Amino acid sequence: MTHPSFIRLRFAFKLSFAIVAALFLGFHLQLETPRWSVLTAAIVSAGPAFAAGGEPFSGAIRHRGWLRIIGTFIGCIGGLVIIVLTIRAPVLTLMLCCLWAGICTWISSLVRVENSYAFGLAGYTALIIIVTTGETPLLTPQFAVERCSEIVLGIVCAVMADLLFSPRSIKQDIDRLVDKVLVDQYRLLQLCIQPAEKSEIDRAWNELVKNTTSLNGMRSYLMMESSRWQRCNRRLQVLHTESLALITQACETYLVMSNHPEVISAELKTMLSEPAQTPAEIHQQMKKLRQFIAASHSEAIPHTISSWVGAATRYLLLSKGIQTNSSINQVEEDILAGDAPVKPISAEGHHAMINGLRTGIATAIGGLFWLWTGWTSGAGCMVMIAVVTSLAMRTPNPRRMALDFLVGVIIALPIGALYFMFIIPSTQQSMLLLCISLGVLAFIIGIEVQKRRLGSLGTLASTINIIVLSNPMIFNVRQFLDSALGQIVGCFVSLIVLLLIRDNAKDRTGRTLLNRFVYSAVSALTTNKTKRGENHLPALYQQLNQLLMMFPADIDKYRLALTLIIAHQRLNRTEIPVNAELSAFHKQIRSTAERVITVNNDQKRRYYFARLLQELDQYQQKLVDYQAADAVIRPVKRLTEMLRKYQSALI
């Protein structure tokens, strides 16, 4: 039952069943265009499979379905508003629609990747409605309602297929990853204490950051499966923070050991070097370490080690509750209540603007070309431009996604012609034969989609789109060729636009992310208890993971970012003297650090960065004047020296 071939075949059956059910119910319920139901069932089922490279989890399919419903409703409302306001000016209607598509793409580039699909869909849904009802604008409300109904039917069929063919729960994968992360955390600490080679430590914490991020991303899929996982979800959210704290403490231990190798006693080092390959062995190891720490003088144990043991103990407690999904006891409730993560601010503003411009300009060019030439395939071409540019922008490689669409629509032409001209006309008298013929196509493509074959997803969607499954069926060969040609030209234009309008915001976004780490470090300089109690680790590591995705080969950037995260944690636990003058100076430093992020001029950025360094030097002197402890002055001095050393990378 768990053999890879069986799982691939099972998903292919799921996809075939979802498409066939949507087709049958669409005709049975006398929907005008069952094609939308079939297309929705195909995209909702196959899209997550293509992204995952295998059978998707049940939560992923339902999450995709909800996003499609939300995006469709937003797009329908947007389309209706545009038509009501500009019904007497068709050109203005079309241009406003292009502007709407660009704005939706811009928003989709700013929100979380998991939710971006809804806004991308909203952008081109309004365009589809306006283009389709261009000659009969008074029927737009009816068309919008019908489209929403067809979309919901397709999603219901996709979810039903997943439930019938053994839904794949993500819970077992979460349990396995929770255990793996704990073992890897212990191994990272051992590497940092030895200490091992930098490259080996880099690989270890890099892998841990990715796995911890993946574990946090699985929460939404788990909640989509069933509401009974709410307790698990709460525990996983805090477990994510504890895992990030473990990474930070281990890496800080490495930095401390690099400068002061004698800080850890030989006895403690021997205990930490003992092997532990399972969570049970690590549990026993934590017992020994807690007893040793309790019996030792507080100054004999480095703060990073005692903090690491405390975080690992909380991790073990939460992981047990995650595996059993038992009721939350009072100890766990205290841990859960103490976590208040801060939401991260997107650093992709410029990148999002470029994405919105790409979609808006490309769609407007397609629309103007259609109006100027009167080309019968112009509407389909324009819609395809909007679809490709909206959906491709949020992927790691937009050009690769656009190429996938282009290959898919080219392959869909002969396959669609075979179905439209020969197979479907031959099955007109039998719904069973029609369902079997379409089911076979879905089954074959369902296997290829899981292999992430170039063009597989585009072939499935484009073939369903051009064979025009309407009620009643009309076999107009010229209309078929126009639709197929419009798809091909639209995808080609989209690829050309992506190649011509280059996104040069990568370096700028990377610099902004690094300066956000600087801001987070200096923002820890505060005496406000509420601000000091905020949990910045999830937001900081989300930005670090984004840096990893953008610059996969630039290890120096990761080290700098991680060092700044460690600096933030050091300053956050430092007991800063409560003083009105120091508090006012804290605000001034934060304001300067924020200006380093927000200014667009390089010369001004250098000015504010130099001013930030000057203010940090003045702040150190103020701490000396107010007779602050050396434990307070030292972290500020380290941060200042680090910023001065790496200022070329930050400005």
UniProtKB/Swiss-Prot annotation:
This is p-hydroxybenzoic acid efflux pump subunit AaeB. GO terms for molecular function: transmembrane transporter activity. Keywords: Cell inner membrane, Cell membrane, Membrane, Transmembrane, Transmembrane helix, Transport. It is found in: Cell inner membrane. Forms an efflux pump with AaeA. Could function as a metabolic relief valve, allowing to eliminate certain compounds when they accumulate to high levels in the cell. It is a multi-pass membrane protein. InterPro entries: PHBA_efflux_AaeB/fusaric-R (IPR006726), PHBA_efflux_pump_AaeB (IPR023706). The keyword Plastid does not apply. NCBIfam families: PRK10631.1 (NF007916). GO terms for cellular component: plasma membrane. It comes from Yersinia pestis. Belongs to the aromatic acid exporter ArAE (TC 2.A.85) family. The gene is aaeB.
